[in-house]
């Protein structure tokens, strides 16, 4: 069984160097929405030690290197619109939120490919596909609130 380490002050400082101080949250009020997904009930609520909001893949890579080196659990999170409690920090550690990574990087109409960052709303992908005359079939009922 793996042993995880808590998020100590020096690791927090490193995270702030990677993404900037304003994108590492530790205030309980800011952590609350990240302590659960759409499943309700006190037994499903687990506060992360922090929420980290990277802006790009390079920052994600540096964050994951740090977490791996220090054995700190990382919980990747989209919009938190699921019902499986998969974005909840049950083992402690921090939530890595993709909400700042919300850009459409490319629409290749010849090959019918859209490249998006993980924080793009599903409804936006669907809308862009329709505007180009295509259909994005993965349209969940939570498309207005879920990330791709």
Where are these regions (language model features)?
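Conserved PLP cofactor-binding pocket of PLP-dependent enzymes
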Residues: 77
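Phosphate/diphosphate-binding loops
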Residues: 123, 127-129
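N-terminal flexible segment immediately upstream of the FAD-binding catalytic core
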Residues: 1-65, 69, 81-112, 141-148
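Short beta-strands and strand-coil junctions in structured, solvent-facing domains, enriched
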Residues: 61, 122-123
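Extended, alpha-helix-rich binding/interface surfaces that flank or overlap catalytic cores
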Residues: 119
């Amino acid at each position: 069984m793996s042993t995880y380490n808590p998020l100590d002050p020096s690791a927090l400082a490193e995270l702030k160097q990677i993404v900037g101080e304003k994108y590492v949250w530790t205030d309980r009020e800011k952590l609350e929405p990240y302590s659960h997904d759409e499943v309700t009930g006190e037994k499903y609520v687990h506060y992360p030690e922090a929420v980290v909001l990277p802006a790009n893949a390079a920052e994600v890579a540096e964050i994951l290197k740090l977490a791996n080196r220090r054995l700190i659990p990382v919980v990747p999170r989209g919009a938190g619109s699921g019902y499986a409690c998969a974005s909840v920090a049950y083992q402690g550690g921090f939530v890595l939120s993709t909400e700042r990574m919300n850009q459409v990087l490319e629409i290749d109409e010849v090959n019918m490919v859209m490249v998006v960052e993980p924080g793009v709303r599903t409804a936006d992908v669907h809308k862009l596909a329709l505007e180009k005359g295509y259909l994005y079939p993965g349209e969940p009922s939570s498309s207005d609130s879920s990330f791709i």
